[in-house]
Amino acid sequence: ECGIAEQDMVSQAGSFATEGYIPIVHSFSSFLTSRPNEQIYNNSTENTKIIYSGFLAGLLPGGPGHSHQAVRDIASMSGINNLEMIQPNSEKQVKEFLNYSIKSPNNIYLRFCSIPFELPDKFDELSKLKKGHGNTISDGEELCIMTYSPILLNEICKSKKLLLENNINPKVISMPWLNVFDNNWIIKELNNLHLIIVEDHYVEGGFAEKISLAISRLDIDIKIDVIALEEVPKSGTNQEVLDYHGLSSEKIKEKILSLIQP
């Protein structure tokens, strides 16, 4: 860490990496992925190995305002070659993905939610680290809701309970890999489903665009809809912000019903 000097920090990390070290660069996601983007790109083109750790990623917390809400970080890091983007969803996954990141030959961006959140029952038991694979948290039929955010995963699981009252039983998938996808897994888990992607990032340049591109290259039948940010994020309490942007459990349920009902 170098305080609020992310460009210097990333440049120093590049120097350490040329000497054989594996630096872990840490800052708030909104600043880490934007201010030193040039230095991150240069490090990557020089084939140096660095792990970038971004905290406060996504829409929440809602209090600090949009300068601190990292809702374009995935887009900002998309043009970096040899970079894998991952969002761990639990303490267990943090350890697993940090070990993976150290062993991987590629640069890594670890996207962290660093506010308290709840996870579905038996989440860690259901979650296995396999490159490019998501984890099915709850089985369902015809409809699949996918996210990478632990906060949104909790909201989606609550939405599923509300949807069951309408005789709609969606599959729920947690997908920690943001730009690496296994084609065989996609075919096995998503073929012939209506996929609804929920993310705490702008629609443009986010996870949905990446997995949609991967799906478009396969000979499979998947309808895709996206629930994500479409305007500059508002500030307020966490619940107010989720409600406003349609990412609370009730709002997700309402949006899904509007997408699937004629």
Region locations from a protein language model:
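Short pre-catalytic strand/loop immediately N-terminal to key active-site residues, enriched for Gly-Thr
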Residues: 1
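Glycine-rich oxoanion-binding loops at beta->alpha junctions
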Residues: 4-6, 10
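Conserved thiamine diphosphate
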Residues: 5, 15-144, 153-154, 170
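Short alpha-helical basic/polar micro-motif
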Residues: 11, 75, 250
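Thiamine diphosphate
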Residues: 61-64, 111-262
